[in-house]
């Protein structure tokens, strides 16, 4: 084998010192990108006048599909091998809205129109969502992405989630405005400003980060709308949570797990939080609408928010 005394171990950011010690006539390196310190090696060799041979990374054949992590891998398998998983995964309204923001911002900055918008999930993984529509309106750009909830029984599945982006020189923030079909917060306890749009904190952070990638400073107004959201909201927990006139833009992980028990239990937690914020000292758990009507008659002094339906999750509710 190769003589052990001729092996010199690589130390990050010590390329020039290594080459000074070895004094090679040439170096051979592979195209390894940032993680392999490719650029640093090349720059150090050039400064010393050392000949460089780089093994170029081969192009992937069309049959290869790059993925950025477990979410992308699962989505690719679901697409290529239908039925491999019993239920398809999907994306939250927060991720969907963020994709619309990315596409609109890209166009607003004069960078053209995207067929798919890359979005960074809270986990750090990059996923891409197809853009359904993009257009310019005077001083704004409007983009729409269709919500894909996978096989989760989500009332928003297939609905257009739209983002309207405007630059606003009158302030320096990324500001969120209520659009058609997005609810307005009317009660405390959700961690959102009363009177503001029902856009949860994680989606706000996701959208803000994507805007600042392309527009580091200056005011930006983001209006999220869901044209069918007002009607869909009547089939959600929003009326109980004090969210009126539309749905919420939600999502903690950015991904919808099919038939997610987490979403139901999360809604129960929010209801309890609101009841507590309104000063309720007692919570009445009940199985559904019929039993709730009965217990409301038994406890007429309690506020409406003190009555919480547990569905199939009585243990989690307790």
Spans of model-derived segments:
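Active-site rim loops that border cofactor/substrate pockets in soluble metabolic enzymes
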Residues: 1-22, 293-313
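A structural signal for small-residue-enriched, beta-sheet-centric alpha/beta enzyme cores
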Residues: 88-94, 238-248, 252-318
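Generic N-terminal targeting/processing segments that precede catalytic cores or assembly contacts
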Residues: 84-241
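Non-catalytic interface/targeting segments
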Residues: 1-12, 67, 72-80
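Anion (oxyanion) recognition and catalysis
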Residues: 43-46, 157, 276
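A C-terminal functional module that forms or caps the active site or interfaces directly
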Residues: 10-48, 52-57
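General beta-strand structural signal in soluble alpha/beta enzymes
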Residues: 9, 28-29, 54, 176-178, ...
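Conserved active-site and cofactor/substrate-binding residues in soluble primary-metabolism enzymes
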Residues: 36-40, 68-72, 91-99, 154-160, ...
């Amino acid at each position: 084998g190769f003589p052990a005394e001729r092996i010199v171990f690589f130390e990050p950011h010590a390329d020039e010192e290594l080459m000074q010690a070895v004094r090679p006539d040439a170096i051979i390196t592979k195209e390894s990108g940032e993680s392999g310190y490719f650029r640093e090696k090349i720059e150090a060799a050039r400064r010393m006048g050392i000949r460089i041979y780089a093994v170029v990374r081969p192009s992937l054949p069309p049959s290869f599909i790059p993925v950025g992590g477990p979410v992308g891998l699962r989505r690719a398998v679901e697409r290529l091998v239908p039925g491999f998983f019993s239920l398809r995964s999907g994306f939250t309204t927060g991720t969907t809205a963020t994709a619309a923001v990315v596409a609109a911002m890209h166009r607003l900055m004069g960078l053209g129109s995207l067929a798919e918008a890359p979005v960074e999930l809270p986990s750090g993984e990059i996923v891409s969502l197809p853009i359904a529509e993009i257009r310019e309106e005077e001083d704004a750009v409007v983009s729409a992405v269709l919500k894909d909830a996978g096989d989760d029984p989500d009332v928003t599945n297939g609905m257009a989630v739209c983002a309207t982006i405007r630059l606003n020189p009158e302030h320096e923030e990324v500001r969120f405005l209520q659009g058609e079909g997005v609810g307005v917060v009317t009660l405390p306890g959700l961690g959102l400003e009363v009177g503001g749009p029902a856009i949860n904190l994680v989606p706000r952070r996701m959208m803000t980060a994507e805007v600042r990638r392309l527009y580091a400073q200056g005011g930006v107004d983001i209006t999220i709308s869901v044209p069918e959201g007002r009607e869909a909201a009547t089939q959600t927990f929003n009326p109980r949570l004090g969210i009126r006139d539309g749905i919420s833009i939600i999502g903690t992980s950015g991904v919808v797990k099919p038939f997610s028990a987490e979403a139901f239990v999360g809604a129960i937690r929010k209801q309890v939080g609101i009841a507590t914020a309104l000063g309720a000292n007692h919570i009445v758990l009940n199985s559904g609408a019929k039993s709730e009507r009965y217990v409301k008659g038994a406890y007429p002094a309690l506020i409406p928010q003190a009555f919480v339906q547990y569905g199939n999750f009585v243990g989690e509710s307790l």
